[in-house]
Amino acid sequence: MDASAGGGGNSLPTAGADGAKRRVCYFYDAEVGNYYYGQGHPMKPHRIRMTHALLAHYGLLDQMQVLKPHPARDRDLCRFHADDYVAFLRSVTPETQQDQIRALKRFNVGEDCPVFDGLYSFCQTYAGGSVGGAVKLNHGHDIAINWAGGLHHAKKCEASGFCYVNDIVLAILELLKYHQRVLYVDIDIHHGDGVEEAFYTTDRVMTVSFHKFGDYFPGTGDIRDIGHSKGKYYSLNVPLDDGIDDESYQSLFKPIMGKVMEVFRPGAVVLQCGADSLSGDRLGCFNLSIRGHAECVRFMRSFNVPLLLLGGGGYTIRNVARCWCYETGVALGHELTDKMPPNEYFEYFGPDYTLHVAPSNMENKNTRQQLDDIRSRLLDNLSKLRHAPSVQFQERPPEAELPEQDEDQEDPDERHHADSDVEMDDVKPLDDSGRRSSIQNVRVKRESAETDAADQDGNRVAAENTKGTEPAADGVGSSKQTVPTDASAMAIDEPGSLKVEPDNSNKLQDQPSVHQKT
């Protein structure tokens, strides 16, 4: 179908590769909007249903392959997460949690990350979408989208910051089966600590996070945190202050990411599009417009490298839906009209009923000198990467057995949770104090960009940090052996048919080890 068809407007103007049409797939499960963190909690999965409704009424669903993700299984999650943590998530319920107080404390499940009905199914759903998106990119799609994913704070053995399972790490591990190097970019207002930590000692994954830094959750992401051992200079942190606007943000994003693409040369890119960096977010303090936020998507799309777009934070949910709808249009090369089409959530977008909202007049505390210093320092770090790492091709491990089914016939309101969309944006939010309370306990591993004195014992430290987490052939941080593909594995591109992986295919060796900060 032509990109200009449907109710959305005109195609984006062609500007090099950015104007070209892309093969896009989109993962959505109608059940995801039913999950409910609880009364007063700012995280509302219902925003995914609102986004989907806008995509439908803008005519975008007809322009991409719409897929229902297959739920990730225990063994899929255990490619990164600890077995006992996954077992706990599977077993705990609101009725049984009082009998598991020690486990709740051990795995950091509680106020920020509550136990709610269907918790494990929720984790399986959003993780399955992200891993499924990675599989689609490995098989020729240009862009894969999972707005339910992007939960970047989850650690190997604990929940954090509203996140239970780190779908991003799992998706990157899947991409590493086909690509020598994978780039992770995070534009959520909060530092992407869980992903950075997982790949802190490898040169096969570069992580770049643009975030609010200071007395703000999770308290990590200092510009001096650059990676360790083989991963030195492969972690980039861009610390920002309150009120940053589109112009200031792009004055950093484009030169830094342009240089990253030049020196790292990734085979695939994962972009976490947390919408809490938008102006007016309930938990945020930035001043980005939707167009400014989406400019990051547009810029990364222009490199014509396989791109996985994920969600993340975002707590003024009417603006989250606006943002991710518009960014889906950008992914498709399709400029959407500002006047919003009638839809089942139309009343929530008043009084203007437009796709875009104006940023506020809040003060931009990021001075020109500060921005120039950050840009100069990070570009200098990138100049120390003389060449992109290479990896020898050997036998490839079996890919994730995550069949999807077409979503066209799904009823998006089936089994609708009565409370999931009652509390929209007007409920007084939980303040950031609970999340901030953990900042004082965070011990960040830092390595100065100017000092190489610690390099001599780098291998020893890395070995100690990764002891017991060396990957099996099919993943990082798992003690399990590779699971052979069997006749029950479903084909990705043709739901319902059978697919068996050949035994003599190629594999990327040297899967990165998981780095656990202590």
Curated annotation (Swiss-Prot):
Enzyme class: hydrolase
Keyword Cell membrane: no
EC number: 3.5.1.98
Domain of life, per lineage: Eukaryota
Free-text comment on the cofactor: Binds 1 zinc ion per subunit.
GO biological process entries: epigenetic regulation of gene expression
Region Histone deacetylase, residue ranges: 22-333
InterPro entries to which the protein is assigned, alphabetical: HDAC_PDAC, His_deacetylse, His_deacetylse_1, His_deacetylse_dom, His_deacetylse_dom_sf, Ureohydrolase_dom_sf
Annotated spans, Disordered: 387-518
Expression across tissues: Expressed in roots and leaves.
Sequence positions that bind Zn(2+): 188, 190, 276
Subcellular location: Nucleus
Comp. bias regions, Acidic residues: 401-412
Keyword presence, Transcription: yes
Gene Ontology terms: cellular component: nucleus
Cofactor requirements of the protein: Zn(2+)
Chief location bin: nucleus
Catalytic residues (positions): 153
Biological function: Responsible for the deacetylation of lysine residues on the N-terminal part of the core histones (H2A, H2B, H3 and H4). Histone deacetylation gives a tag for epigenetic repression and plays an important role in transcriptional regulation, cell cycle progression and developmental events. Histone deacetylases act via the formation of large multiprotein complexes. Negatively regulates the expression of the NAC48/NAC6 gene that controls root growth in seedlings.
Family statement: Belongs to the histone deacetylase family. HD Type 1 subfamily.
PANTHER family: HISTONE DEACETYLASE 19, HISTONE DEACETYLASE HDAC1-RELATED
Note: Plants over-expressing HDAC1 exhibit increased growth rate and altered plant architecture. Plants silencing HDAC1 exhibit narrow leaves, reduced diameter of stems and reduced plant height.
Quaternary structure and interacting proteins, as annotated: Interacts with TPR3.
Annotated protein name in UniProt: Histone deacetylase 1
